[in-house]
């Protein structure tokens, strides 16, 4: 989850399951977009979907082949326990729960140990 207007390196790609140009801002998002592209259970997905508050974006909103929605937020492991990260994830989880999405989760980079 990021704030709208995030200023950082952006990789733009065209993926067949993504409704628009897929913009990724870190390696976790990029790799997960590739995984969604190859996942047969995913019909389509959107990247960086703006929330109603006009300030934040969710990393991935996916539509599964059964019509159910799935939301994923990408977080680097080193930021998982930071207060700002926790606050942003709480905002995202509450928002998508209010909109009836039960399949909400995190995508975290691999443990380097």
Task: Give the ranges of each region predicted by the language model.
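Electrostatic, structured charged patches in enzyme active sites and in nucleic-acid/phosphate-binding
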Residues: 1-113
């Amino acid at each position: 989850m990021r704030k709208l207007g995030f200023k950082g390196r952006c990789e733009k790609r065209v993926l067949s399951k993504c409704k628009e140009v897929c913009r990724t801002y870190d390696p976790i998002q990029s790799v997960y977009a590739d995984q969604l592209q190859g996942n047969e259970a995913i019909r389509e997905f959107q990247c960086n979907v703006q929330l109603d508050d006009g300030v934040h974006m969710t990393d991935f909103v996916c539509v599964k082949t059964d019509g159910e929605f799935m939301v994923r937020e990408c977080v680097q492991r080193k930021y998982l326990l930071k207060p700002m990260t926790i606050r942003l994830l709480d905002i995202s989880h509450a928002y998508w729960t209010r909109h009836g999405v039960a399949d909400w989760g995190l995508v975290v980079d691999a443990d380097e140990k």
